[in-house]
Amino acid sequence: SKTCQGNTIRRNAQDIKELIDHLGLEHVVLLGWSLASSIVVSYAAEFEQYKLNGLVTMDGSLYPFSDADWNHHRGRDYNLQNWFDTFLPLYYAPKLFYDKFIARVSCAEGMDDEIRAWFEAECKKTMPWTALELHYDFCLTDNFSNLKKITVPYAVFGAQSKAYGLDMVDRFAAEVRGYSEVHKFYKSGHLMFLY
């Protein structure tokens, strides 16, 4: 059987362009959370903000393997061993992966059983090898440098966490050439919209 491939940041950005064209959309505001922050910034840069009226990123690093001072991602400075230790269990030990992942993305109070079941079910809709391919490409892709191409209004939301940190959002907003807003969350964790 053929394994899925091509699930990259760039390909996802191209999918957005194709969907906007297919639906005949105008005046689009794109929002990307977590890894998808990199996808929407990649779209804006690659397609010169085609049909965009605004851009929003929520708690997502734009270059996880970067050694920059704003980057607190566990893959910082090409820490491949940490990436392998953190993400490969998705393939060979899914329960271990989800236990650690959910603890990392939840707010301080944790996640109740009903929300956890929903969250895991949503995550499992993507095959492990496809998810790993996309996440690895996300870590390798420098979308921080693409922020200087952004001229549409830009809002960045960030949560205080070890994985990301709030200095990241200030740096991102400072890089864009147009209007920007920063929104910081101090207690909600990576899933800020859920709590």
Model-inferred region functions:
Residues 41, 45-46, 51-89:
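Flexible "cap/lid" loop of the alpha/beta hydrolase fold
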Residues 151-189:
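Conserved loop-alpha-helix segment in the C-terminal half of the alpha/beta-hydrolase fold
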